[in-house]
Amino acid sequence: MHERGPVSRESYVLYKTRNVSRGIMLYYPAIYYRSGTARGAAASPAAPASRTSYFTTMRLLALNKPFGTICQFSPHETRASLADWVKVPNVYPAGRLDSDSEGLLLLTDDGALQARIAEPRHKLVKRYWAQVEGAVDAATLKKLAGGVDLGDYVTRPCRAEYVEPTDTLWARTPPIRYRAAIPTTWIELSITEGKNRQVRRMTAAVGFPTLRLVRVGIGALDVFSLGLQPGESVELPLKAPWEGMA
């Protein structure tokens, strides 16, 4: 439960100690308890105005995580952490990005929303731009799209296509290694799993190591449309990742 933040921990304690009846209402994106839902009292659906003090103002932030930043708030001896870029208290990452990956990261103080964004069972699409070493052909894109056997699991089918980065893509600091004799290819992968280093493992498994990896989208959100440069963040409506989606 520690990954879900204080809201989820408190709701979990209420549930496990049976101090709250089953008469609760999921009022997206969080759970609200009417004061009369304590065990022994009649439970009824609650409107947002009737939430208890367990739930204060919930927040959702989008951050363009810079290269080299570790995905935690605890300080690190040699690397930047999220605390260097995000000054809003009590928010936690909804999913992760490796320190050597860049791009869109969502943070929230609501455990239910955090889970809905991050957990693979909810199948929220995450879009990645990967600059890989070598000239990727159509057959390789088909392999990536059909699912890749990584040894410990086979990835879900996904969308894989060529992409040509525009001037809106920021330069990485430091830049990738450059080899004059070896071309590179930019591809876009749209996946719903987001397991540990999944995109990098997928491209390596089909013979094209990833040199640079940028998460450009989560659900309906796009880092370019948000206008975020590395290290910049913006607060969003709680339903933003799903706005406009079918």
Which sequence ranges carry the predicted segments?
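Short, positively charged and aromatic/hydrophobic N-terminal segments
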Residues: 15, 24-28, 32, 53-54
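Absolute protein N-terminus
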Residues: 9, 18, 57-58
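Compositionally biased, low-complexity flexible segments
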Residues: 37-48
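RNA pseudouridine synthases
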Residues: 54-246
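Short hydrophobic alpha-helical segments enriched in small aliphatic residues
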Residues: 3, 13-16, 20
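N-terminal, intrinsically disordered, basic low-complexity segments enriched in Arg/Pro/Ser/Thr
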Residues: 2-7, 36
